[in-house]
């Protein structure tokens, strides 16, 4: 009888079962970025919604049934009604992130057809919008150059295969063709006009309100950094096009679940009524003096340690938005005994303790923009522990 060898199952170790997603102290220059989990809620907001989350997570819920009529309904109905009131739009669709909005729109509405888009608006950053559009099955007709595109460029690109005029938010673009002009051109030729606002700052509502006032075919944006919510992509626009997207087979693969819908509902409610509960609102409305006071407090906590400590002006950055550099301060430290502990080693040891910083000119820098009082105390304790072991 032949020997049958069985593959051994690797042992389950405590480290394997430990939650990989640990709290960090973000003293880096970037706030709400992909590396650090993007958006997060304020403690007071979480306390308010915790009972609702508990209900959703520990009980069956009426996700797709109307408790008044006993009929099946769409899971988005409650949220759609709130979005329509807040934004005065015809129709709304929600998918799992903003990349999905772009892919779904291109795949469902421009399959094997041409999307005319400015070359300059597709470049920059880690997110390659061009690849997403090409993967959708649509064809791209690029116009203009790296930082300029005129209305005449779009007009000259029109042909029998044209289906959509696409615009995406790119603050670095120097010569921008207004969406209003693109929309007029699209209407003239019976094309879809679509504006991808991406991570536009919706705490200043003007950007979205101006676009929606034009009654575009479609507009999309990211929910988490736009009004500090769960990660999701929001599509708004004319009912004809949104209904086509909703009925497309791909939508089912991209739709959001009950937890995201619950978080979105309460986030939008707070965005409308209680902006002081929104983390991004609080951070963006910090005064220069308040930031300096945080830097001075951290300086005072670190000064007694075996460190060279100083305060410097700096900038913090919201997500991947190039136009969102915000004036701030940082506390710079350097071990006095660099033979035992240089900056690179200190940076790594801090990282391993969940304190994320940056290195600049042989100094480890603590950006104070997104730090709170508890974070400052924790940083001092972690540094003291590291220095004692050096």
Swiss-Prot record:
Its cofactor is pyridoxal 5'-phosphate. One of its GO terms (cellular component) is cytoplasm. One of its GO terms (biological process) is selenocysteine incorporation. InterPro entries: PyrdxlP-dep_Trfase, PyrdxlP-dep_Trfase_major, SelA-like, SelA_trans. The keyword Cytoplasm applies. It comes from the Bacteria. The keyword NAD does not apply. Pathway: Aminoacyl-tRNA biosynthesis; selenocysteinyl-tRNA(Sec) biosynthesis; selenocysteinyl-tRNA(Sec) from L-seryl-tRNA(Sec) (bacterial route): step 1/1. It catalyses: L-seryl-tRNA(Sec) + selenophosphate + H(+) = L-selenocysteinyl-tRNA(Sec) + phosphate. Its EC number is 2.9.1.1. The modification N6-(pyridoxal phosphate)lysine is found at residue 225. It is found in: Cytoplasm. Its main location: cytoplasm. Pfam families: SelA. GO terms for molecular function: L-seryl-tRNA(Sec) selenium transferase activity. Keywords: Cytoplasm, Protein biosynthesis, Pyridoxal phosphate, Selenium, Transferase. Belongs to the SelA family. Converts seryl-tRNA(Sec) to selenocysteinyl-tRNA(Sec) required for selenoprotein biosynthesis. This is L-seryl-tRNA(Sec) selenium transferase. The gene is selA.
